């Protein structure tokens, strides 16, 4: 995919390497053409105790994506990656853009990193989970949940590797072909 563009739609932070701050340097290092749009801005990962969250309004996010779709460069789009969303209202315009991009640029790959929470705790409002499950998951080719996020998306308890495989298989329908789950509890540790 070295000649196609990846569009990364996720968070930006002042300090740290999460969201677009993590993705873009990797793409640059790999000489992979990539562009980004930020869903939110934060001082740092919320785990650092920061509280200020500046959410890109859904209408603005939708307008930016619609304008991007009018650019000549849009025809070179090969993949879309999404991560953290600050409000459930952001998901509909992103889902619409993914659908339009898929129609205009077949084949396009959509990777959903469902940044929802970890270790049994949601980082986001539950309405984001609902919108993600309803509007983004059906468009995804690849998802990269941690164990907690896989539990939420599949709506099933995951206590071990066997449960994780079962949950992943439950989700693999329609476009979805790859579930790359992290932090799965095993008898000896985690995978």
Where are these regions (language model features)?
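Conserved N-terminal subdomain of the carbohydrate kinase-like
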Residues: 2-112, 116-119
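Conserved phosphate/ATP/ADP-binding segment of small-molecule kinases
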Residues: 123-191
């Amino acid at each position: 995919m070295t000649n196609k563009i990846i569009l990364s739609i996720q968070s930006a932070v002042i300090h740290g390497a999460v969201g677009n701050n993590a993705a873009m340097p990797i793409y640059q290092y790999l000489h992979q053409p990539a562009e980004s749009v930020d869903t939110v801005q934060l001082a740092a990962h919320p785990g650092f105790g920061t509280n200020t969250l500046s959410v890109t309004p859904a209408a603005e996010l939708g307008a930016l994506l619609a304008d991007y779709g009018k650019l000549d460069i849009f025809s070179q789009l090969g993949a879309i990656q999404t991560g953290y969303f600050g409000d459930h209202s952001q998901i509909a315009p992103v889902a619409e853009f993914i659908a339009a991009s898929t129609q205009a640029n077949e084949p396009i790959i959509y990777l959903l990193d469902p940044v929802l929470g970890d270790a049994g705790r949601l980082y986001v409002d539950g309405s984001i989970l609902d919108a993600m499950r309803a509007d983004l998951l059906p468009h995804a080719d690849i998802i990269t949940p941690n164990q907690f996020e896989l539990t939420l998306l599949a709506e099933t308890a995951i206590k071990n590797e066997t449960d994780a495989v079962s949950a992943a298989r439950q989700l693999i329908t329609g476009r979805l072909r790859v579930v790359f789950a992290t932090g799965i509890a095993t008898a000896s540790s985690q995978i």
